[in-house]
Amino acid sequence: GVEAEPENLTYYYLLAIGYAQFERHDDMLAIALRAVPHINERSDKRVAADIYSVLGDSYHQKQMNEEAYQAYEQSLKYNPDNIPVLNNYAYYLSLEQTDLDKAEEMSYRTIKAEPNNATYLDTYAWILFIKGNYAEARIYIDEAMKAEEGNQSDVVVEHCGDIYYMNGEHEKAIEYWQKALELGNESEVLKKKIKLKQYVQE
């Protein structure tokens, strides 16, 4: 393992994934940080990218966004086509409403790579929504809903309501918000949208 072969990045990555499954975020961050000094030009690029990806996710869990973004940049240096990193990085930028053109570009690459992935379609729709491209956002959120049929996530359904609202379909929007609530979304903002029957920004 790590103690016997400190240069072997795969051990660190597997440990980090194990910690992630048990939501042991501090351990996940610690093991990723231990791996970083062992990354060099001889390292397997994909594994190095995955280590930085874990580091980015760990920092984001701790709301250390700048550090998270730096880690994602490093990850993409080692593997520019790391689709989950492109998606997470883009989505987190959109939540902060920062660097939205970059977010849109990264997100677009993910839906080109996996056109039926509901998570990636949702991210792309959400970025378009934040940028005020409501009609286009609706096309992609409809795709996300279709891709998730029968197994919809409350976040995607809430986003769907927001996008429909901004497209002037208020009744439909309220239905989607109600559905998001039924799916277990406990957000106070969502409850406010339903009560006021209008879109409320996070």
Region annotations inferred by a language model:
Residues 14, 54, 88, 123, ...:
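Canonical tetratricopeptide repeat
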Residues 17, 57, 91-92, 126, ...:
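Residue-level recognition of tetratricopeptide repeat
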Residues 2-3, 37, 76-77, 108-112, ...:
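Conserved structural position within tetratricopeptide repeats
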